[in-house]
Curated annotation (Swiss-Prot):
Any GO CC annotation of this UniProt entry: host cell postsynaptic membrane
Signal peptide: 1-22
SUPFAM superfamilies with a match to the protein in the record: omega toxin-like (SSF57059)
Organism of derivation: Cyriopagopus hainanus (Chinese bird spider)
Subcellular location: Secreted
One Pfam short name: Toxin_20
Keyword Signal: yes
Protein name: U4-theraphotoxin-Hhn1a
Length: 85
């Protein structure tokens, strides 16, 4: 009776561990597929750099400081560029 119980518990533990490992692998593969290609990220960075430098230049011509709030989404304006915060 004890041997059967130990065998059942061992099989259950192995099954749980294999299922958990399979779920982790599936989650990792999905994370790798979701990301943006590097070329798209570079284009976004260039757009943010341009937007920030233009907005800073407009503010400087009016003898005002650059508005730090122009860059959004985790970016801030620094040295006439959008910098990731």
């Amino acid at each position: 009776m004890k041997v059967t119980l130990i065998a059942i518990l061992t099989c259950a533990a192995v099954l749980v561990l294999r299922t958990t490992a399979a779920e982790e692998l599936e989650a990792e593969s999905q994370l790798m597929e979701v990301g943006m290609p590097d070329t798209e990220l570079a284009a976004v960075d260039e757009e943010r750099l341009f937007e920030c430098s233009v907005s800073c230049e407009i503010e400087k011509e009016g003898n005002k400081d650059c508005k730090k709030k122009k860059c959004k989404g985790g970016w801030k304006c620094k040295f006439n560029m959008c910098v990731k915060v």
